[in-house]
Amino acid sequence: MASNLPVRSFSEVCCAEARAAIIQMENNPDETVCNRIWKIHRDLQSSDLTTTVQVMMVYRFISKRVPEGCFAILSGVNTGMYNPRELKRSYVQSLSSGTSCEFLRSLDKLAKNLLAVHVCSDVKMSLNKRQVIDFISGEEDPTLHTAEHLTSLALDDSPSAVVYSGWQQEAIKLHNTIRKIATMRPADCKAGKFYSDILSACDQTKELLDAFDQGKLAYDRDVVLIGWMDEIIKIFSKPDYLEAKGVSYQVLKNVSNKVALLRESIWWVTELDGREYLFFDESWYLHGMSAFSDGVPGYEDFIY
């Protein structure tokens, strides 16, 4: 398939409720992280079956492991009207004949979810990216199942395009806003070093992120963005900013408060075996954001 065709990520075609978890797994395919995400959704009573199944399928594809306790998600669900063995047999036949997409579309939601559980639980069955896309995309975008669109998706097993997790997206927006505002400092401003330090921190961060996304460096995107937030917080803790004035300074100050709040919402958690992973407390961040009545003045205007 042509290499210049776009590669769609799972998070682009899954249901909205599963998107955050799937983005996390796509961005950080570490076994410990993905396993934790799967178990959280498996045991989450408020998660509906379709959401849990989509998280399960992406976990199965990324980890190449049978999801632990996958049949537990069917607890309390009446599946007696279906024969899972027959469903699976028909699905395997449709794979051989190239009609799997049409077969999945012929199933109702419960039958498809039941089939997904049995497919994921089969240690002898491998899943490729196209199969997972076929399972999880039907609810969001039926056009993904047309032959022409499937061709344009380049559904292979190569790495997905860069996708940022929820907190990373927010950090990038804040970075772009601060960087843009810092270039608009007043001509007679006495706080030249303050603005220069901000621009330097943002430019260095952008250079690292660009190199990372192009595969030139092996930097961890999480570490780069956290380092940038720490640097911005440090710059605003120095006395240089006291000389800054005007609208641009007010916007910078408000955005820096958001940076500090976002940074406080992210921390490293250490497992019993000594392995570390990042935890983002979105509820803490959103609670703090409620203090901003209408958001940062001119915030959206400076995002590019």
From Swiss-Prot:
Record-linked InterPro entries:
Mx/ML_C (IPR035212)
Keywords for this entry? Answer: Host-virus interaction, Inhibition of host innate immune response by virus, Inhibition of host IRF3 by virus, Inhibition of host IRF7 by virus, Inhibition of host RLR pathway by virus, Viral immunoevasion
Q: Which domain of life is it from?
A: Viruses
* One Pfam family hit: Mx_ML
Please give the biological process terms from Gene Ontology that the record holds: symbiont-mediated suppression of host cytoplasmic pattern recognition receptor signaling pathway via inhibition of IRF3 activity; symbiont-mediated suppression of host cytoplasmic pattern recognition receptor signaling pathway via inhibition of IRF7 activity
Keyword Iron part of the UniProt annotation? no
Please describe what this protein does.
Blocks host IRF3 and IRF7, thereby inhibiting IFN-beta expression and activation of host antiviral state.
Instruction: Please state what the protein is called.
Output: Protein ML
